[in-house]
Amino acid sequence: MLRNRVPRRGLAARRREHEVDAVNVLARPGSSSAARDARWYPTFLAVAATIAGLVLSACGASSRSATACAGSVAPAAAANPVQRENARPGTPGWQIPAGAGSVITGFASEISVAPGQSFHLHVAAPPGSRYRVYVYRLGWYQAAGGRLITCLPGCRSSQVATAQPPPTPPDPVTGLLRAPWQVTDRAAIPPDAVSGYYEAKLEIVSGPHAGAVGAIPLIVRQSPAAAPSAVLVQVPVNTWQAYNRWGGKSLYQFNTPSHALAVSFDRPYDQQMFHDMATALELPWVRFLECNGIDVSYQSDADTDADPGSLPRHRLVFAIGHDEYWTQQMRDAFDRALAAPTNLMFGSNSGEWRMRYADERRTIVEWRDPSLDPAHDPRVDNGFFGAFGEPECRLMGVEHLWAAQRDLTAPPTAYTVAGPASDPWLAAAGLRPGDVIPGVVGYEWDSMIPGCFAGTVTPLMTTRLAGSDGVTHSADMVRATAPSGGLVFAMGTMQLAWALDDLNGRAPDPQLVAFVKAALRDLTRPATPDIHAPRTPATQHPAT
């Protein structure tokens, strides 16, 4: 999230005082904050590139990851769709090097689709070059990491790229720009497709640019006709787009000459930034969940906004990775789900900024400061959720505080067990107070806020580390129990999965694996009332 914030002396009031100091709101070239972020970003990219390179070697080695898959979390009942899908042979070649996409790139007209629907792709490549599109589903697949679903126009054929127009000029007020490209390809998703992270890999197959690749991320939702999965993963596409600098505009000052107040899904993702988000923080979780046979499905932030009633149909909802940007409707959906009760799981720095959609959810609007927002509507004005009386800690038990961030190149810090040895999740892993789980806390983290959460908050792990201001801050992992009985597992870190899967070249930590499996078993037990709530008409929303 990359901004300056002041130490909390309360809740929302302290944030209001210092919103004008936020790097991503009003940082000026040459300011100390902007300079700090300019120093930070190249090192972030270097680490992300290293991680992306390690993907290539990690996918061929299943011995280390076998630790994370031993003793599956899933019950020994009939195989669920994810188990059946991951039993199929994987396909190498889905990996995209960090920083690719400068020669061939593209985006989809849809953020997500249901099985049986299609993605409409807008691909740009040097005119006259021939290219092919490979569509993969990403998952475990015995450590292969992906499976080839189809090729466009065919796995042995290709098509000629035509010229696409330049991006639109940035809007003089908001900085909004789009890529007004024609649809070049249609990727039909089979009716029996399994929900998940999908990827359209773009490759030039002949000519001087042969071998150049790019990628378009795709999300396939669960079929409306299917029984709701036990676990729903919310994919943080809003945050991907907030940091996306393609065309020279993101919501941030640190990676663009001047930040925008609105960004569009009608443009490619900067491939480096996509690796920073999805490859580093999300795919290790996807691999861990699927190798353990978890009954899981996936939907985007935009899907939650379109169908807020979708959350309580599942036993556990996981806001994966770095899920920083929510609409008010999304926040309300999570609040209602916890009251249902549906259990919740978070990484860190989740649901912090309130944004809104425009253009049928193809545009994200984020003015940052409600006093500047031309909407002048307390239900949709932009800013911290805490500025509107809804701090994250009321939902999660923890919250991201000012300067609780540092350079990603710094080695992640260990968590220290803070809960009692009798705690069922800790006991399942043989963890006792004072034990350490190395290398899982860094980049951005969350802290407990006493008296904020309405229920009980049980500390599980903690650590203290210096933030970007040089001051020592706490990072806290907690289990919060709401008055409804719903549980919240707030990890306090985005990097926990770095010790659950070997995607980043590190062997899984056996005790952390056992701990997370115990947590998932508890969080996915059948809830009361019945999790299979009636589907609302909004469920049948079109591709988003």
Where do the PLM segments sit?
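Extracellular low-complexity, Gly/Ser/Thr-rich intrinsically disordered linkers
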Residues: 289-291, 304, 325, 432-533, ...
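Catalytic beta-strand/loop cores that center a nucleophilic Ser/Cys/Thr
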Residues: 190, 194, 378-483
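Helical hinge/lid and interdomain linker segments adjacent to catalytic or ligand-binding clefts
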Residues: 160-177, 186-194, 274-358, 500, ...
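C-terminal region of N-terminal signal peptides and the immediate post-cleavage residues
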Residues: 55-72
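Proline/serine/threonine-rich low-complexity linkers at boundaries of modular beta-sandwich domains
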Residues: 82-103
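Aromatic-Pro/Gly-enriched surface loop or interdomain linker
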Residues: 128, 134-138, 150-153, 210-313, ...
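A glycine-rich, often tryptophan-bearing local segment used as a flexible ligand/cofactor-contacting loop or short
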Residues: 324-422
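Ligand-binding face of N-terminal immunoglobulin V-set domains in extracellular IgSF glycoproteins
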Residues: 105-126, 135-138, 148-150, 157-206, ...
